[in-house]
């Protein structure tokens, strides 16, 4: 089977690698986003997918706008591919491109469709407190993740899982599902299922304001924001930005889902801690070898990992010691 692969970030790498390993699949070309300038020197950095393609000496095409690039369109046609496989490519494909392969354009999407259509399904599923997510393969159409569904695979989201961890799991799961989808497609063994648009939810691009922590929200909501938008959520501490990288919501609903060292240390103090009256963002206690406990609009939140501006990530307890943090200090929403 001749396949053209469209993809860009690390999430797409396992899918491309799995295709390259398969004896019945021939990856004839890779389409990825143009190299992006990074750092102070604005050095052009290739995408993770381009690096894999270079290692395997596969033709690489990097149009700024694939549907408007006549040269790329001609090359795509000339591949005479059986299928196009698309994994987090980052551009919308035109009807002209979708009709080129003999069998279909297959997309690997990081959610259980029709929930979380869009650019950031993993992040928003965690943000909204989902306890399960997965991968859907689908036949692509001109809409945003609206095509007929082919296969699905599920994975649980644990209380302390963040977007990076779930993305790694789903990237590998998606690679397996892509192979299965392509082989079954070739054998005519798939039964496409139309999406019910009434059940659709959306996962748009994340904006900078989505990263700002509002301490008046529920502790679990802030926790889900921190792990869903990892590693970008921030607050203000002593008039400087402070990234919050890992947290744990505290209380009876969470003990069994937290590591034993957290539950065992805090549970005996819980009656006292939970009766404190403090304002949102205020430090109410410092737990040795763990970190500060912060009051939220509803409930308490333990800060497990943070990052001061210009510094490396550090544990909550190292942050307490390094800044000589005191009970009563406040994190602000500025």
UniProtKB/Swiss-Prot annotation:
GO molecular function: methionyl-tRNA formyltransferase activity
Enzyme Commission number(s) from the entry: 2.1.2.9
InterPro entries: Fmt, Formyl_trans_C, Formyl_transf_N, Formyl_transf_N_sf, Formyl_transferase-like_C_sf, GART_AS, Met-tRNA-FMT_C, Met-tRNA-FMT_N
Entry superkingdom: Bacteria
Keywords per UniProt: Protein biosynthesis, Transferase
Residues that coordinate or bind (6S)-5,6,7,8-tetrahydrofolate: 111-114
EC category: transferase
A cellular component term, taken from the record's GO annotations: cytosol
One Pfam match: Formyl_trans_N
Catalytic activity field: L-methionyl-tRNA(fMet) + (6R)-10-formyltetrahydrofolate = N-formyl-L-methionyl-tRNA(fMet) + (6S)-5,6,7,8-tetrahydrofolate + H(+)
NCBIfam families recorded: fmt
Function statement: Attaches a formyl group to the free amino group of methionyl-tRNA(fMet). The formyl group appears to play a dual role in the initiator identity of N-formylmethionyl-tRNA by promoting its recognition by IF2 and preventing the misappropriation of this tRNA by the elongation apparatus.
Family statement: Belongs to the Fmt family.
Protein name stated in the entry: Methionyl-tRNA formyltransferase
Source species of the chain: Gloeothece citriformis (strain PCC 7424)
